[in-house]
Every structure is written in C-alpha cells, then in structure tokens.
Amino acid sequence: MQEMLIKLIKIYQKATFFKPASCRFYPSCSNYSIEALRKYGIVKGGWLTVKRLARCHPYNPGGYDPVP
C-alpha cells in the first residue's frame, strides 16, 4: 500500500512537470510526502503529509521544512 501511494505521487510529479512550481516549501510537498511515507509508514507519514499540505498556501511564507 505504501509503495502504491508513492507511485501515485511520482505519477503526479511527472504529470505536472511542465507546470510552474507553486510549493512554498523545500523540499516540495510531494517530495516531503514520499520521504514521510518511507520514514514513518502510511499512518504517521500520511498525517505529516496532510499537515504539510494544510500549511502550503499563499499566506504561509514557506521555507525549509524537512521531515521530522
């Protein structure tokens, strides 16, 4: 299941390759998600991803935000 989610994220990354980057953070939200899923698994990694996506909006200054 974890690898399937990671593959879906990679498909998303390839599908949006030509779209200008809009993520306010480094690493990007999709790369953060892959790293969180690999490090913590589906439950905790998924929760970290949801929290990160909730912070990725125009009113947040963004910046460097690694997976804990």
From Swiss-Prot:
Alphabetized InterPro entries for the sequence: Membr_insert_effic_factor_YidD
Cell compartments where the protein resides: Cell membrane
Keywords carried by this UniProt record: Cell membrane, Membrane
Record membrane topology: Peripheral membrane protein
Purpose of the protein: Could be involved in insertion of integral membrane proteins into the membrane.
Family under the similarity heading: Belongs to the UPF0161 family.
Protein name in the entry: Putative membrane protein insertion efficiency factor
Organism: Syntrophomonas wolfei subsp. wolfei (strain DSM 2245B / Goettingen)
Organismal lineage: Bacteria, Bacillati, Bacillota, Clostridia, Eubacteriales
